[in-house]
Amino acid sequence: MKRDVESLPEEVVALLTPFFPGLDLTRIRVCEGIPRYVVGDPVGYADRYRIYFAPGAYRVDTIEGLSLIAHEVAHCLQYQRHGAWRFRARYLAAYFKNRLRGMNHLKAYRSIPFEVEAREAEEQVYRALKTLQSGLLETL
């Protein structure tokens, strides 16, 4: 993928739309490179309708890649649902509350309700694609 911003391919939009009712996936733009202000070393980062991927992480040709895209699309839906500033405030508040409870960084991050929801979407897409793949292989 180029460093330029681009739309999700039509096939990806068609594949993921049933998993995200109420979200117009044609509005989503993707680009390579995580913004410098993002803490840590994420493979993906969503900001409203824009998704940033670490170099090489944006893969529309693998089940894992499509599942990662679904994870980030879930965050786009969360932004739409809560608004940008409210989403960010709640996200950070949940993280810091988890840290104050004594969780290490990774556990605090993974316990953020927004991340739990995004992982559920990621896993749902992964399972659906694996089932589809199995059915396809059985027909061969």
What feature does the model see in each segment?
Residues 55, 77-78, 122:
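Activation segment
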